[in-house]
A protein has these predicted regions:
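Catalytic phosphate/metal-binding cores of nucleic-acid and nucleotide-processing enzymes, i.e., regions
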Residues: 1-89
Length: 89
C-alpha cells in the first residue's frame, strides 16, 4: 500500500542527493502504543515501500543517513507525515 501511494505522489530522489535523513511526524489516535512500537515498525514499512516504488534504490547505510521522530495525538485524523532532507540541502 505504501509503494502504490508513493508511486502516485512522489518522484525518485536523485542519486547525488544521498544519503538522506527522514523526519517522521507520527499522529496517533491516542497514547496507547509505546513510541518505539509506533516508529520502529512504521519506519520499516515506509522505507520498504519507498524502495519498492522506486523512489530510492535501497534503504541501507549508503542511502539513509538517519531519522528524526516526533509524536502527536490527533484523535480525528491519525497519520504519518514524512519529510526527506537530502545530502544536498
Amino acid at each position: 500500500m505504501v509503494a502504490v501511494a508513493a508511486k502516485k505522489r512522489l518522484t525518485p530522489i536523485p542519486e547525488h542527493c544521498f544519503p538522506v535523513t527522514f523526519r517522521f511526524q507520527w499522529y496517533e489516535r491516542n497514547r496507547r502504543r509505546d513510541k518505539d512500537n509506533v516508529s520502529a515498525f512504521g519506519r520499516k514499512v515506509v522505507l520498504d515501500g519507498l524502495v519498492q516504488a522506486g523512489i530510492m534504490p535501497n534503504d541501507n547505510w549508503n542511502y539513509v543517513e538517519g531519522f528524526r521522530d516526533e509524536f502527536y495525538v490527533d484523535r480525528d485524523c491519525p497519520r504519518v507525515r514524512i519529510e526527506v532532507y537530502t545530502y544536498a540541502e
